[in-house]
Structure formats: structure tokens, C-alpha cells
Design a protein with these regions (language model features):
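Acidic, surface-exposed loops and disordered segments
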Residues: 1-211
């Protein structure tokens, strides 16, 4: 058990999370807001309670804990759906390290993996057509990872667009627009800065590793 769940109920704290998560104030309407955190503090405290002297958690420990937290979050999504509830992942919880860490009182061995908002979907949302995803051949590799040629990327990009009834008019321009909106955006840079701050506590070399 390498994760914990923080249910956020206080209105002011909800507002802060909505603000730090890219000003997504619709979050405030959700009946349930939960933050899944990768948690090594619990085990370190448990070890100490038993008289052990735990080593400092490393990047591998952080990676494993983050996987645990995300798996638990997806299980909550599936469970919620079985009750007719809708959910949404808020990846922006990784941003604004200082403010989120203070608001949730996170020790150094604990950091957010994701945030979920859960509520009752409207009829319009229930009837909304799901967008087509990329073809499985673009996602699933056999035996080893296969690096694809530019024309292969374009083929699968255009193939998905056709199934979504939004034909690609200018492939380079559309990809560039997405690149600017997501990969090169202000929030993306802030997310990476914040992630480095969270993981700094796990990235320090131990004396054993230095040897």
C-alpha cells in the first residue's frame, strides 16, 4: 500500500485547488474531490514504529508509489461508473508545488499522483458520443518498441480524424497547434518545474549509491 487518498471538503481548499489546477472552477461543483498521493511516509513511520531505521526513499520507490496511486484511482473510476457516477482526472494537480503541498500538508515523502472529481453526469453527458481513439496498431507494439517514420504518424493521425468526422486539412499546422497548446504551454512548463520539486526529495543519492 504505497498510496493515500485525501478527500477535499473545505470550500476554501477546493477553491485553491480549482485555481492551481489551471483555473478549472467547474471542479467546485463536484460532490466529491479526491487527491491520490504517492505515499512513502506511512511505511517509513511504520518501520520506525517497529524499531527499524528506514533508508531514504529513492526514485524507484517514488515511481512504484505513483503507479500504485494511479491504479487505485482507476479502480475508483470503475467503481463509481458501476453506480452511475461520472468522473474526471485532473492532471494539473501536479502544478503549483508550493501551494498544493502547503494546502494538503504533504511531507517530503508524499506527492500528488492525480486528482479525481466525481459526480452525477447530465443526460447530455450520458448521450455524448465518445471520440474515436488512435488505431490499436499505433499503440500496441509486438516484442519491442518500434520507432515510426513521419508518414506513419501522419497516416494514423489522419485515420483517427476521419473516424471523428474531422478530416485533416493541414497535418503540420494541426500538430503544431496542439504542440503549442499542450507541450510548449505555460502550464506544461510549470508542471515540469513542480514535478522536479516534488521528486527532489527522492532524487538525492545515498551514501551507498555514491560508493
Amino acid at each position: 500500500l504505497l498510496y493515500s487518498i485525501i478527500e477535499v471538503r473545505e470550500e476554501e481548499k477546493r477553491k485553491l485547488l480549482a485555481e492551481t489546477c489551471d483555473q478549472q472552477y467547474w471542479i467546485l461543483k463536484a460532490p466529491l474531490i479526491v487527491v491520490f498521493v504517492a505515499d512513502h511516509r506511512r511505511w517509513c513511520d511504520l518501520y520506525r514504529a517497529a524499531g527499524c531505521t528506514p533508508r531514504k526513499p529513492g526514485l524507484g520507490d517514488a515511481w512504484l508509489a505513483m503507479s500504485d496511486a494511479n491504479i487505485a484511482a482507476q479502480n475508483m473510476v470503475i467503481a463509481a461508473e458501476s453506480f452511475g457516477l461520472g468522473s474526471g482526472y485532473i492532471g494539473d494537480i501536479i502544478e503549483q508545488h508550493e501551494r498544493v503541498k502547503e494546502a494538503l500538508c504533504l511531507p517530503d515523502e508524499v506527492f500528488p499522483a492525480c486528482m479525481l472529481v466525481i459526480g452525477h453526469p447530465s443526460e447530455q453527458q450520458k448521450q455524448r458520443k465518445k471520440p474515436a481513439r488512435f488505431h490499436r496498431d499505433y499503440i500496441v507494439h509486438t516484442e519491442v518498441y518500434h520507432t515510426m517514420e513521419p508518414q506513419v504518424h501522419q497516416h494514423f493521425f489522419e485515420e483517427r480524424a476521419l473516424r471523428n468526422e474531422t478530416p485533416v486539412v493541414d497535418f503540420p499546422a494541426q500538430v503544431e497547434a496542439f504542440w503549442k497548446r499542450k507541450y510548449e504551454s505555460v502550464f506544461s512548463r510549470e508542471m515540469n518545474r513542480s514535478a522536479r520539486a516534488y521528486l527532489a526529495a527522492f532524487a538525492e543519492e545515498t551514501e551507498e549509491e555514491k560508493r
